[in-house]
Amino acid sequence: MRLVEGIQANSFLVIVGAGPVGLMLSTCLARLGYRIKHVDNRAEPTPTGRADGIQPRSLDLLRNMGLKSAIMAHKPARVYEVAFWDPAGDSKGIVRTGTWASCPAFIDARYPFTTLLHQGLIERVFISDLVKNGVKVQRPWKISGFKSDEAENPEYPVEVHLEHVDGTEREMVRAKYLFGGEGARSFVRERLGIGITHKDPIAHVWGVMDGVVKTDFPDIKVSPRIIFWPVSSRRQN
């Protein structure tokens, strides 16, 4: 195996992670003409459903950016209401315990619904806009280290080390800023010693599935929240 190492041109910003957050930032800065280095450790955009919901105010923002039409071209689901279901006491089955509007009246939003669309399709909308502005996400690459020294290089103080996921290539980039958009397992955040404040990680379990469902469940087009209580915390009558 031959290792190829190189030093890249200085960048205004290095972005690690090409999920919706990293891509949104990259899209905004690319439109303003900034030099961006954007890497992601996956060979392709997200292949399955993950964070598939676009909130009403986010859709407003996408409209202002001229990207809403590209999102809506995929004919996403529009959710106007959320329903909650709980186990039906001592009997079998579940019962609806409440509903509320997906976008309550007190929220100042142009679109009163949550938009549901495969995350990979959302990412591709941003990626298409990036290409128009001369930015390509470098895949599959990851960050391996970084340091900052303003005394050594006050204009581009951040030194970022990147490598191909198979270890055959490495790069060193100098930048003004480094942005970690890698999600829960962020290398950047961990190296900076920034923890995540959250509740008991086993208190709630989420499941996400992609599929075509044949069902008579009454709230299938609403956005149901079915709550299952663990044995240790079942409510007592």
What residues fall within each predicted segment?
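Beta1/beta-strand and adjacent pyrophosphate-binding region of the FAD-binding site
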Residues: 3-21, 37
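Conserved structural-core and active-site-/substrate-pathway-adjacent residues in large, well-folded domains
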Residues: 26, 62, 123-126, 130, ...
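General small-molecule cofactor/ligand-binding pocket signal
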Residues: 136-138, 197
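A conserved short coil-to-beta-strand element within the FAD-binding core of flavoproteins
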Residues: 139-158
